[in-house]
UniProtKB/Swiss-Prot annotation:
Keywords: Golgi apparatus, Membrane, Protein transport, Transport. It is found in: Golgi apparatus membrane. GO terms for biological process: intracellular protein transport. It is a peripheral membrane protein. The keyword Endoplasmic reticulum does not apply. GO terms for cellular component: Golgi apparatus; Golgi membrane; Golgi transport complex. This is Conserved oligomeric Golgi complex subunit 7. InterPro entries: COG7. Belongs to the COG7 family. The keyword Cytoplasm does not apply.
Length: 770
């Protein structure tokens, strides 16, 4: 039987009984079912008995074990209580121990302080006693003249004195000790000088040790500097008393200094802790003690050279100095990190310092030099052809002078003199343009372009025009080379002075300028020989201007700048003057003939047979000589203007496109000549002819009817010439022709739509009512 179901939570008696009967015999009768039920009852009774028995045993065991558990719990409670009492006692012991220990440590600290004070007092007493002992013995020690023993005594006294700072007579003891050190120094000085002079390493080491112990190392170095400085100064004196030129004297001095650097560095490395700094200071002191001084020698030599050669001589001297500086830089460079950079900067200043006054006024010196040299370039000669030739040759000379000035600026100022250079170049170009202008005026006079003889014969002479074309080509070469030079100048300025421009610089901002200086100071150590900058401190305004120039060149690019804008403008004006000269040389002959028009008496005087020809048609009249000469001259212009078309000259082409001709086309006119420079010139001369012709016609006071027809015939002839050349006659000339041809009774009708003043003037000439 399965009794486990009695333990289930959902146990149901009926279900269990039904299930038990279903599991019994299937084919039994009612009697068997009763038997099966009796069996089940019996089994249940047996099972109940077993359960009761098991419960009884379990209860009995529980009752037996209960006193033991209670006793264990009671014992555990007693042990816990005892443990609590013990922990309280331990806590109190710890607290008491802490209090006792704290008091003990405080006592120990106080005892230690007392001990330290007692030791300090004892040491002070010992040192005081030692000072007294040493002070008493020092005189006897000095009598021995044993420098090592004396030094040891003084070192002991010095150490004792350090313990006696708070004593009342401390200052007196300091004075006494310094006096004793002075006596030792005086006693040792002959031996020191002998050791340094003979370059005795062992003896020098002894003195270095002694003077280090008594804190007198600067005084020992002073002996060292004095010994070797005397030798170098004596060398300079010998050089100055010789007959050698200054550049040779400088070479001798610099060779001696460079030799001293190498020998003394090698020796000082064995003696001093900082040998490179010691030898650097030796050179600084030597350069500063030269008699006569280098600035004085340079000034005297430059003054003797005179204005013409002062800059040349100065650069020769500077080359010698720069060569020496390069030698020193190469000597210092391998050990630059071992050097005191402050002292190296002082050495750089000492080497280049004598040139600073000249570098600061470099711009003025360069300007004077360039003006003297450009004044020596001849531009005017007796003959026009020679003058034109000199103008052509002068271009190369001009830009040769300018390029040489740029080289001098880069070499002498390392680009820092750029502002002065630009001013000097501006003056150079201005002076050259002035000379060139004077030469053009001279050529005008020699060609008699401004003085036209009233009765001179009409002669064609194209020499002046051909010379003018060569001058225009020269102007084109000037403009071309000026553009190239300006580009080269910008690149050179950036390559030489660009290193001085800080990345943090902002233009026109003092704060940004100062920030850039601070940034430069905070930047990693650089080579002082390459960073020498005389301008920033001595002329900050010019330095700020230089920074703006460099910033502009860097930001906008070296091809987009206006370094020589004023000079370019002046050269463009020069080109314009050359154009005017060429134009006047062509137009002179035409103007000469046109000026005769208003002076002719035939306009208002009745000629022989005039009454017979009044009614003749206009075609029976022929143009007068003056207009025929002009017409033939204009017809020959294309042949003589042909060089503008056939000549392949880039400079001439540049000048022609840059120049502007007088008498530009009227508004509304067709401009076919603009595509060809020769046609452009032909059109300008033609318009000048027509305008001048109109002006002189309107100056005629009175014309007879016959003269009116003759004048109209002359105008028609000129208009036909213009048509033959493909040029457009001016409206004013056409209007005058129409007014001259109009019959008196039709004059008012013809003049409608024409300029009122023009119509009135022509009416007055003809005597027509208007």
């Amino acid at each position: 039987m399965d009794f486990s179901k009695f333990l289930a939570d959902d146990f149901d008696v009926k279900d269990w009984i039904n299930a038990a009967f279903r599991a019994g015999p299937k084919d039994g009768a009612a009697g068997k079912a009763d038997g099966h039920a009796a069996t089940l009852v019996m089994k249940l009774q047996l099972f109940i008995q077993e359960v009761n028995h098991a419960v009884e045993e379990t209860s009995l065991q529980a009752l037996q074990n209960m006193p033991k558990v209670l006793r264990d719990v009671e014992a555990l409670k007693q042990e816990a209580s005892f443990l609590k009492e013990q922990m309280i006692l331990v806590k109190e012991d710890i607290k008491k121990f802490e209090q006792d220990t704290s008091q003990s440590m405080q006592v120990l600290v106080e005892i230690d302080q007392v001990k330290s004070r007692m030791q300090l007092a004892a040491e002070s007493l010992q040192e005081a006693d030692k000072w007294s002992t040493l002070s008493a013995d020092i005189e006897e020690t000095f009598k021995t003249q044993d420098i090592a023993v004396i030094s040891a005594k003084l070192t002991g006294m010095q150490n004792s004195l350090m313990m006696l700072v708070d004593t009342p007579d401390y200052s007196e003891k300091c004075v006494h000790l310094e006096a004793l050190k002075n006596r030792l120094e005086a006693l040792a000085s002959p031996q020191i000088v002998a050791a340094f002079t003979s370059q005795s390493v062992d003896q020098s080491k002894v003195f270095v040790k002694v003077f280090t112990e008594i804190d007198r190392m600067p005084q020992l170095l002073a002996y060292y500097y004095k010994c070797h400085k005397v030798q170098l100064l004596a060398t300079w004196q010998e050089l100055c008393q010789s007959d050698l030129p200054l550049d040779r004297q400088l070479t001798g001095l610099y060779d001696a200094l460079l030799g001293a650097w190498h020998t003394q560095t090698q020796w000082a490395t064995q003696v001093f802790k900082n040998p490179h700094e010691v030898v650097t200071v030796l050179l600084i002191q030597t350069l500063g003690a030269l008699v006569p001084s280098l600035p004085m020698c340079l000034s005297a030599a430059v003054e003797r050279a005179g204005p013409e050669l002062e800059l040349t001589r100065l650069l020769e001297f500077y080359d010698t100095t720069a060569h020496f500086a390069k030698g020193l830089e190469m000597a210092l460079l391998p050990h630059l990190q071992d050097h005191n950079l402050v002292k190296v900067v002082e050495l750089v200043d000492a080497v280049y310092g004598p040139y600073k006054p000249f570098q600061l006024k470099y711009g003025d010196m360069e300007e004077n030099n360039l003006l003297i040299q450009i004044s020596a370039v001849p531009l005017e000669h007796g003959e026009v052809i020679d003058c034109v030739q000199e103008l052509s040759h002068s271009v190369h000379k001009l830009f040769g002078l300018a390029s040489a000035a740029v080289d001098r600026c880069a070499k002498f100022t390392n680009g820092l003199g750029t502002c002065g250079l630009l001013t000097a170049l501006k003056s150079l170009f201005a002076k050259y343009v002035s000379h060139f202008t004077n030469a053009l005026q001279s050529i005008r006079k020699k060609c008699k372009l401004d003085d036209i003889p009233p009765n001179s014969l009409f002669q064609e002479d194209w020499t002046a025009f051909q010379n003018s074309v060569r001058i225009i080509a020269t102007c084109g070469e000037l403009l071309r080379q000026c553009g190239d030079f300006e580009q080269q100048l910008a690149n050179r300025i950036l390559s030489t002075a660009g290193k001085y421009l800080s990345d943090s610089y902002s233009p026109r901002s003092l704060a940004g300028f100062q920030d850039s200086i601070l940034t430069d100071k905070k930047s990693p150590a650089k080579n002082p020989w390459q960073e020498y900058n005389y301008l920033q401190k001595d002329n900050p305004a010019e330095y700020a201007s230089l920074m703006e120039i460099l910033y502009t060149l860097k930001e906008k690019g070296s091809s987009n700048h206006n370094l020589l804008s004023a000079s370019r403008t002046a050269l463009t004006r020069l080109n314009q003057q050359a154009h005017q000269l060429a134009f006047d040389s062509v137009f002179l002959r035409i103007k000469q003939q046109l000026l005769l028009v208003s002076r002719m008496d035939s306009w208002n005087t009745a000629g022989i047979g005039e009454t017979l020809t009044d009614d003749l048609p206009a075609f029976s009249l022929t143009p007068l000589e003056y207009i025929s000469n002009i017409g033939q001259y204009i017809m020959s212009l294309p042949l003589n203007l042909e060089p503008f078309v056939t000549q392949e000259d880039s400079a001439l082409e540049l000048a022609l496109h840059a120049g502007k001709l007088p008498f530009p086309p009227e508004q509304g006119d067709e401009l076919p000549e603009l595509d060809n420079m020769a046609d452009n010139w032909l059109g300008s001369i033609a318009r000048a002819t027509m305008q001048t012709y109109c002006d002189v016609i309107l100056q005629i006071p009175e014309v007879t009817p016959h003269s009116t027809k003759q004048l109209a015939t002359d105008i028609d002839y000129l208009i036909n010439v213009m048509d033959a050349l493909g040029l457009q006659p001016s409206r004013t000339l056409q209007n005058i022709a129409a007014l001259l041809k109009a019959k008196p009774e039709e004059y008012r009708q013809v003049s409608k739509g024409l300029p009122r003043r023009l119509a009135a003037t022509v009416a007055t000439m003809r005597g027509v009512n208007y």
